[in-house]
Amino acid sequence: IDSMHTLCGKFQYDKIFRQELLNLITINETYFMRELNQLNSAMQYANTLSISGNTVKILCAPCSSGEEVYSLGILAKTIGIDKYRLKITGIDINSDMIQKCKEGIYNERSVKNIRQSQKEIYFKKVNSDYKIKQELMPMIEFKTINIFNDSLFALGQFDIILSRNMMIYFDENYRLLTIERFAKILKPYGRIYFGSADLVPYCDLYSKIIDISGTYYEKV
C-alpha cells in the first residue's frame, strides 16, 4: 500500500483486509469481575425479570475476549437464575477476540478476581491457563458485529445492555450515535450500564439512575 488513498480504498472494498486491520487496531483490556458492583446490579435486575418466567436477554457490547460475558454467567449461576431463562450475547468488531471468546481459555491475570472456590467450579485447568466450563453457563452466543452496522438491529431486543469503557475512544457525535442506536434494541424500561470512565452525553431517550451499586440508564 503506497498511499493513504490506496489504503482507504482497500479498507472500503476489501472485507478481509478491513477485518484484519480492525483486529490489529482495536484495544482489548479486560478481566473477570471487572467493576463488580455493576455486574451484581445487572444480575439482580435480571433475576427479578426472570422470576416472571420470561427469558432475560443481555447484550455485552463490546465483549472483548469474553470475560464480562462469562462473569455474568458465573454470577447468574451463583444467585440461582435458571440457565434456560437467560441469554447473553457478546458482540465485538474484532473477529480474533470473538474466536477467543468461543474458546474460553484465560490466563492467570484474567481470573485474578475469581475466588479459588469459583475457579474449581467454573474452570478446568489447562496447563497454566483456565478454560471456562461452558456447560455450566446460561445460553451464550458471540458474534462479530460493528455497532455502527445495521446488523446490530438483527439481534432483537434486550433487557440489559453493558457497554463499558468503549465510548472513551469516541468523540461527542459518535457517543450520542452509540446511545441512540442502543436505544433501538433496548426494551422499554431496560437498563444500560456504561463504564466509569465513559462520558455519556445527555439523551432524552434515557433516565439516569444513581443507585448504591452504581449508575445506570433506564430507557423511557
Regions found by a protein language model. Name each.
Residues 78-84:
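Short helix-capping segments at alpha-helix termini
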Residues 1-59:
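Conserved AdoMet
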Residues 176-188:
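A short glycine-rich, Lys/Arg-flanked "PGG" loop and its adjoining helix->strand segment in the class I
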Residues 43-47, 70-73, 77, 183:
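A structural alpha-helix within SAM-dependent methyltransferase catalytic domains
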Residues 54-66, 71, 89:
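Conserved class I S-adenosyl-L-methionine
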Residues 188-196:
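Conserved beta-strand signature within the Rossmann-like core of class I S-adenosyl-L-methionine
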Residues 84-162, 166-170, 174, 199-201, ...:
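Extended basic-aromatic, gly/pro-enriched interface segments that bind polyanionic ligands
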Residues 211-216:
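Short hydrophobic/aromatic beta-strand or adjacent loop that forms the aromatic wall/cage
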